[in-house]
Amino acid sequence: MAVNAGVRVIATTRNRDRFSKLEKLGAERCEIERRDLSKHIAEAKKIDAVLDLVGNSVMLDSLAMLRRGGRSCLAGWLGGLDPIPDFNPLLQMASGVYLTFFGSFVFGTPGFPLSDVPLQQIAADAVAGRLDVKPARIFKFDEIREAHRAMEANQAGGKMVVVHH
């Protein structure tokens, strides 16, 4: 979706084998996810926005990549929910950067009505082939244990769907 909106994307993943898939989806380039990525990329301090799906374990590093006026949205907790020890925004965030968070549990609430989500455009992009919405794996309901095993072993390779008939 970001690429369709004209955004230049640097994707991160824990698995180098996923680079080609991410590049096919439009990522300009890929990096191996690490806690100190900001120290290893040329764009550090020049990035407009970070969508942080890893969470608290890399949040400070995500903030360190941003330019003045840049925004980081914490929207996932793949790295766990452990709090950031002694987090002090005055000392650990650059002046002029923004941190926000989004939890999908707010969809449909008065603060985030579903009518604000461009579902028709997302569906149109999927139908036109501009957005790949195919799940990586589909499981029957009686295969739910295998789905959990794959997810916990980091073998999902994308979104998984469990079908109940």
Question: What does each of the following model-derived ranges do?
Answer:
Residues 1-35:
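Mid-domain Rossmann-like dinucleotide-binding core that forms the NAD(H)/NADP(H) cofactor-binding site
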Residues 19, 38, 59-60:
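Short, well-ordered alpha-helical microsegments
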Residues 34, 54, 76:
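Glycine-rich, N-terminal phosphate-binding loop of Rossmann-like dinucleotide-binding domains
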Residues 35-45:
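Short amphipathic alpha-helix with an adjacent loop that forms part of the alpha/beta core around
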